[in-house]
């Protein structure tokens, strides 16, 4: 079954083509990073308009990359939530029109479920074997930080989520405080690599399997102020002092966020007896997070390649395949659900 997946939940326009839920044929993505960088973050109205402009060209790129034509597509899948409501509406309406014109089945997909199934597209995963269920899934991005138990295809139980900022959002805010660019995750990681004496941050203590990053953000602001780095207009540190202080603060902040994510994930494994850990979402591209989980996980670790960690249409197509195989379909009344949950 050849599934075409469409992703427009935030600021990436993605169209992917996946055969049989496992074979990646195309993964075309139009990024809006440069558009939103001037604002220091994603502007919802701007994102929606950019999706309108990018969807048709991105669809054409995906079809060309896969070497297929639209009539060969067996089903159309689209992210219907969670996400920015305007961006979701653009994608959902485009998918409905496309499926209707082609006379093909339509399926709405949870964006977070898509991040889980990005791991099914990893070439190193044995195509003849399923990962061992249950899996503890850490889904960390700019909009979400959830710990979910996947007990089988389409079977999820929420173990914990962030009480305030998402991990990716925390990185974005930290980068802004330190005068770095957008998106913050790659910028923080790059600066952390230059650190000579990483600044220690307090350990995040939250009951259960929930997360919290607002305290770390406050600690960063105070330390940046003490170092004469923040607010930028009143910065008093010399250029050389600033560069060293920024790198050390970035390294300490990254260490604290990663440690919180790793500790809760491993605790989730201990509590549930899970047979594996799955990492998904934009933050899963962080090299330190991958390294720490690989070093400390007592069970197999499933991690998509970096290009599949960020938002894309291929992961939506992969997730849709397993639901379509069970006979699931949506009608033409499919709508956007910006607060949709998983588990």
What kind of region is each of these model predictions?
Residues 78-81, 98, 141, 277-286:
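Glycine-rich beta-strand-to-loop/alpha-helix junction loops that act as flexible
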């Amino acid at each position: 079954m050849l599934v075409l997946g469409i992703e427009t939940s935030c600021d990436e326009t993605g169209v992917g083509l996946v055969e049989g839920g496992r074979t990646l044929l195309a993964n075309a993505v139009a990024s809006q990073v440069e558009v939103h960088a001037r604002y220091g973050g994603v502007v919802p109205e701007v994102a929606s308009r950019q999706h309108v402009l990018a969807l048709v060209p991105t669809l054409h790129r995906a079809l060309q990359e896969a070497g297929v034509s639209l009539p060969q597509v067996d089903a159309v899948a689209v992210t219907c939530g969670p996400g920015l409501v305007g961006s979701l509406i653009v994608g959902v309406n485009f998918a409905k029109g496309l499926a209707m014109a082609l006379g093909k089945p339509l399926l709405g997909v949870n964006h977070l479920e898509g991040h889980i199934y990005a791991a099914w597209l990893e070439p190193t995963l044995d195509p003849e074997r399923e990962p061992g269920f249950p899996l503890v899934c850490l889904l960390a991005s700019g909009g979400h930080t959830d710990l979910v138990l996947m007990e089988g295809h389409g079977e999820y139980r929420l173990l914990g989520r962030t009480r305030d900022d998402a991990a990716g959002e925390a990185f974005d805010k930290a980068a802004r405080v330190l005068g770095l660019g957008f998106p913050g995750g790659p910028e923080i990681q790059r600066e952390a690599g230059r650190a000579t004496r990483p600044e220690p941050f307090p350990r995040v203590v939250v009951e259960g399997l929930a997360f919290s990053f607002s305290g770390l953000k406050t600690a960063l602001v105070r330390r940046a102020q003490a170092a004469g780095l923040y607010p930028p207009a009143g910065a008093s540190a010399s250029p050389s002092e600033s560069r060293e202080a920024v790198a050390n603060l970035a390294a300490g902040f990254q260490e604290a966020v990663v440690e919180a994510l790793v500790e809760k994930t491993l605790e989730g494994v201990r509590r549930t007896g899970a047979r594996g850990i799955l990492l998904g979402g934009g933050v899963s591209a962080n090299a330190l997070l991958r390294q720490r989980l690989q070093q400390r996980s007592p069970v197999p670790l499933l991690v998509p390649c970096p290009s599949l960690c960020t938002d894309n249409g291929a992961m939506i197509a992969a997730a849709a395949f397993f639901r379509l195989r069970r006979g699931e379909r949506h009608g033409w009344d499919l709508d956007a659900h910006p607060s949709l949950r998983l588990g």
